[in-house]
């Protein structure tokens, strides 16, 4: 595998600390849908659906380059039901979602893959890092739920900040990424021969250097298995895999979500908001 194309990668959920450039993988519970949201024109959205945001947290100077799958290292995002995709203005990547449409129905809950962006000209940040200025006001009383499971309501701090989103470049996932197209049709994104990446790499919009790499909405049991590549400040790369490392690859158990304890029970990595 050429690391320049799909940099092997490293993704970890929660707040696992490492000696390398990757500090954490953070899973943010962004929003929990209610009855009003379910009745929007954006497509079928079951009550109680959870919108998750996944961030790669890196040391200063490091860049997110790619999430990848190759033989022996499956890249997988899955739910036991279906992923929600907004049928009105949704997209497989957020770069194609106009800022002006974010206020419409449930566009803000669309499922997509990212390299830092959250819309056409906005970047994604943790709600807890949002200053609450220029918060999006949703039309017709949508997205007003204050479920404590999701922490800060998005009507107060929406997790968007102005910026130039890095463009997502995909390799070999044209069929797989269709699960995030503008209709709810599937429950699994999987590839063993492809990646989503950003040429030149991307850094986070805050000093913490967290890059948003995906947003997924589902009412099912959400899980993933990730492999990630990040670029070092000196121009090198660090590659992290969920299983079976070879060569210079680094295996990190937290790339599998939810994690499994030694006794076989499952343990959710630390999420935002804290439990």
Language model: regions and residue ranges:
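Non-catalytic macromolecular-recognition regions in eukaryotic signaling proteins
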Residues: 20-267
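Bacterial Sec-dependent N-terminal signal peptides
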Residues: 1-24, 268-275
């Amino acid at each position: 595998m050429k690391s320049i194309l799909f940099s092997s990668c490293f993704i970890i959920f929660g707040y696992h600390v490492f000696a390398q450039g990757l500090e954490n993988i953070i899973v943010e519970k962004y929003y929990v849908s209610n009855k009003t949201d379910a009745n929007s024109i954006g497509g079928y959205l079951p009550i109680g659906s959870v919108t998750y945001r996944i961030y790669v947290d890196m040391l200063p100077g490091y860049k997110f380059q790619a999430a990848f799958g190759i033989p022996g290292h499956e890249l997988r995002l899955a739910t036991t039901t279906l992923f929600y995709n907004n049928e009105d203005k949704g997209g497989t990547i957020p770069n194609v979602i106009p800022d002006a449409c974010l206020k419409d129905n449930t566009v803000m809950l669309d499922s997509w893959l990212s390299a830092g962006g959250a819309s056409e000209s906005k970047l994604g940040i943790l709600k807890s890092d949002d200053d609450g200025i220029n918060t999006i006001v949703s039309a017709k009383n949508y997205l007003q739920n204050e479920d404590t499971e999701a922490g800060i309501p998005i009507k107060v701090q929406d997790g968007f900040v102005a910026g130039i989103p890095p463009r997502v470049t995909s390799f070999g996932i044209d069929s797989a990424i269709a699960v995030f197209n503008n209709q709810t049709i599937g429950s699994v994104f999987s590839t063993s021969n492809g990646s989503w990446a950003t040429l030149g790499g991307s850094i986070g919009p805050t000093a913490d250097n967290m890059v948003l790499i995906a947003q997924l909405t589902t009412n099912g049991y959400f899980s993933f298995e990730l492999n990630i590549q990040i670029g070092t400040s000196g121009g090198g790369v660090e590659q992290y895999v969920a299983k079976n490392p070879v060569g210079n690859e680094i295996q990190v158990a937290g790339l599998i979500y939810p994690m499994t304890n030694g006794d076989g029970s499952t343990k959710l990595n630390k999420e935002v908001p804290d439990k």
